[in-house]
């Protein structure tokens, strides 16, 4: 039996795993944060204040117990959410929510590289397949960050329905710098696989959304 698309599928998966490796420290922090707080609250449960009235102790224990339960539920929910990075469950996300999530995930990359992104103030609404679109948006951003010189700013524009644009400053990164984490070719690979299209010009990289996913009205 022949599988003509298998090499392309494997290539897409390979790029997705590269991206996951880049954002995993942030995801790990999201998982460990609630669990660490729950451990602290559990330790406080074992250290009751001396001489406190019985009613106050009972209320304190109940409050801390509720906190532990809530934190554990949050941690479990975050762990389950990691599955959405490994397989497509068919979930959709609004364009604004997707870009906001990407903003959080690339924050450390920007901080360490001394680069900044001017995020769009208005975003044309679109409901996007979360799995493929999130990987594509992250690939686009990570590749663009590599194109920036230190202390440079990238400007994103998502106000026009059907297209996201990234405008690069005049000065690019030093050609002798480290190779990009994600290459433009890999961004194009993910775009084609997800039904998008990337267009690169000297100072502007544009991602064209699949036409059936755009709606038209601007969101703040």
Roles of regions detected by a PLM:
Residues 59-116:
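Conserved DHp (HisKA) dimerization/phosphotransfer helix of two-component histidine kinases, i.e.
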Residues 2-5, 9-12, 16-23, 31, ...:
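Histidine phosphotransfer helical core of two-component systems
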